[in-house]
Amino acid sequence: MTTSGALFPSLVPGSRGSSTKYLVEFRAGKMSLKGTTVTPDKRKGLVYIQQTDDSLIHFCWKDRTSGTVEDDLIIFPDDCEFKRVPQCPSGRVYVLKFKAGSKRLFFWMQEPKTDQDEEHCRKVNECLNNPPMPGSLGASGSSGHELSALGGEGGLQSLLGNMSHSQLMQLIGPAGLGGLGGLGALTGPGLASLLGSSGPPASSSSSSSRSQSAAVTPSSSTSSARATPAPSAPAAASATSPSPAPSSGNGTSTAASPTQPIQLSDLQSILATMNVPAGPGGSQQVDLASVLTPEIMAPILANADVQERLLPYLPSGESLPQTADEIQNTLTSPQFQQALGMFSAALASGQLGPLMCQFGLPAEAVEAANKGDVEAFAKAMQNNAKSDPKEGDTKDKKDEEEDMSLD
């Protein structure tokens, strides 16, 4: 996972390595599911949860003997639940169950004592569904006056206007704009560019999507044939779980150098804490979530051309087939509807104009975004779509011209 690059490379270079401090970690092995039976993988393993510098939460499992990380799942709030399997005789089997689809991952505890099993389970659910705010773990950052200067009148728009397309995509992607990362993963980079939100941080913990966690890297390994100790007797020495020291342990986490470059994550933090004001002139705001209801979307999604255009933006994964039904499930999910509402609020704030300009939207759409007029923005996008010739029509017309030239 790459870290966010500096927005101002002309300043003294600085870097932020990925945080190596685990939010939760405990020794546990994997289990393979065949039919209705789970079989333990006897390898010594470690389950841990880590928050990287892009604010994403990773649920990981690694082989403690080889050090190989076999599972690295990006999880968003309300994606899944970690709970004990009551049908297991030993009582030490737990399952990570995704709320969307049938994806389930089973683990068996390898800690010598059982008294912390339920506490580990509670911490896992807490970290997955209520992740800590970025920077709350002591990661170094830019000084307060630098961040407040960015949020000044005109400063933020000027900064956004000078950002490259790739930086904007990173900003509005998995970790950008109020933590609406689930939506970015849900719809892919093409649609995520228009579906960020600068809503208050209180809503960011619930604005998730089940998608990218399902676009996780599925484990490709099965039960190993190597001779290992019995599951009930983990070795004391080799089973000691590694706990790397946090990268910010040099004592300078709270006093950043004035010349330290402002990082992309700093701007994300600013946008995440921005208050969305009421619409200009007290005009009534349009909530896209109340407009794009499942009933209205159903006939649109039934169109084969629409399906063909949306399919590439669906996540690919073992339990997420790229089908028309999956499009329907995605766009009618509560998470997507909530994200639409948050995007409506952000658009109505009048602060997304510079971003819309960067994405090459028509002048009418940019002007509407600057005014916070959601209805005018939608009409501008609709008019632009009507004025652009369809790819198929252009191709047919070109073929006709070639045929005429041959005659």
UniProtKB/Swiss-Prot annotation:
Keyword Ubl conjugation: yes
Cross-link Glycyl lysine isopeptide (Lys-Gly) (interchain with G-Cter in ubiquitin), where in sequence: 34
Residue spans of biased composition, Basic and acidic residues class: 387-398
Compositional bias ranges of the Low complexity kind: 196-254
Domain Pru positions: 18-131
Record carries keyword Ubl conjugation: yes
Modified residues (Phosphoserine): 15, 140, 211, 405
GO cellular component: cytoplasm; nucleus; proteasome complex
Region (Interaction with UCHL5): 362-407
Role: Component of the 26S proteasome, a multiprotein complex involved in the ATP-dependent degradation of ubiquitinated proteins. This complex plays a key role in the maintenance of protein homeostasis by removing misfolded or damaged proteins, which could impair cellular functions, and by removing proteins whose functions are no longer required. Therefore, the proteasome participates in numerous cellular processes, including cell cycle progression, apoptosis, or DNA damage repair. Within the complex, functions as a proteasomal ubiquitin receptor.
Name of protein: Proteasomal ubiquitin receptor ADRM1
Organism in which the protein naturally occurs: Mus musculus (Mouse)
Designated gene of the protein: Adrm1
